[in-house]
């Protein structure tokens, strides 16, 4: 069907679909979310609303650079709530690893597929052949991996799980229950398919209270016990904290807390 028809159906509980960056998808991306060149980055599609809430390229690539010196296990970069895939393609580009992005929104999934294609041309890396975007429910881990492995004709492992769930635009509290997909559901779904000490980055609201951060800590501990972790606050200056994330397993460093300044 037409690209506009593809965006209408909800995908919760339905088998995921591989998004093909074909002419229909390109036409849909150009008409619904004109591409914009990122400073020192690729040209990416996103609607104005997506750009308001998405991770900027400068932040996405700064995060990826922090991982460059870590010893990640073999495998792919997984983002089960990838949006327009800015963070995913930054990680794939800098780490030269294939990526698997899953997006529930039928409006965003085609954009993610085109952005993956655009970034592969821009970076000229060798990570693109087995990179895919799936339209579907990011909590359906087994079905997602099955669809992905069928698509690439091989099986592979997950090197890094990056999670940045959508949060309500008008939320004041930014509680864990407001995240979509829910963090506890995502981690419980993917845990059986990860290594015993997986590398994770959980992108969270900087408005989380200490008690809410403890909730996230407890959630991680309930699955992976005393796995190493580092809480990271990121600032772009102006005297405020812009980003909060939890780096787990091989993604963590020797400190339990750190402040990253984006220059």
Language model feature labels by segment:
Residues 74-81:
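Conserved class I S-adenosyl-L-methionine
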Residues 1-72, 107-154:
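S-adenosyl-L-methionine
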Residues 75, 159, 198:
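Conserved acidic residues
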Residues 98-103:
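Conserved SAM-binding motif I beta-strand of class I
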Residues 82, 106, 140, 167-168, ...:
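Short, glycine/acidic-enriched loop or turn micro-motifs at the edges of active sites
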Residues 84-96:
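Conserved SAM-binding loop of SAM-dependent methyltransferases across substrates and taxa
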Residues 1-7, 162-263:
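Class I S-adenosyl-L-methionine
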């Amino acid at each position: 069907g037409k690209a506009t028809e593809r965006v209408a159906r909800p995908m919760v509980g339905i088998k995921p679909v591989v998004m093909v960056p074909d002419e229909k998808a390109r036409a849909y991306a150009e008409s619904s979310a004109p591409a914009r060149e990122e400073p020192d980055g690729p040209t990416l599609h996103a609607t104005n609303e997506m750009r308001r809430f998405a991770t900027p390229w400068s932040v996405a690539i700064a995060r990826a650079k922090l991982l460059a010196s870590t010893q990640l296990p073999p495998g792919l970069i997984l983002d089960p709530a990838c949006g327009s895939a800015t963070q995913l393609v930054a990680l794939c580009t800098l780490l030269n690893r294939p990526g698997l992005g899953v997006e529930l929104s039928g409006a965003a999934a085609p954009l993610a597929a085109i952005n993956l294609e655009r970034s592969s041309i821009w970076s000229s890396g060798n990570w693109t052949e087995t990179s895919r975007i799936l339209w579907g429910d990011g909590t359906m881990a087994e079905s997602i991996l099955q669809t992905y492995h069928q698509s690439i004709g091989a099986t592979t492992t997950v090197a890094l799980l990056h999670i940045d769930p959508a949060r309500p635009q008008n939320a004041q509290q930014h509680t864990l229950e407001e995240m979509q997909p829910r963090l506890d559901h995502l981690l419980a779904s993917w845990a059986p398919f990860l290594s015993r000490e997986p590398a994770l980055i959980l992108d969270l609201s900087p408005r989380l209270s200490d008690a809410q951060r403890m909730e996230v800590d407890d959630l991680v501990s309930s699955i992976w016990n005393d796995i190493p972790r580092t809480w990271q606050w990121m600032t772009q200056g102006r005297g405020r904290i812009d980003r909060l994330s939890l780096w787990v397993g091989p993604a963590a460093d020797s400190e339990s807390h750190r402040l990253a300044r984006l220059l």
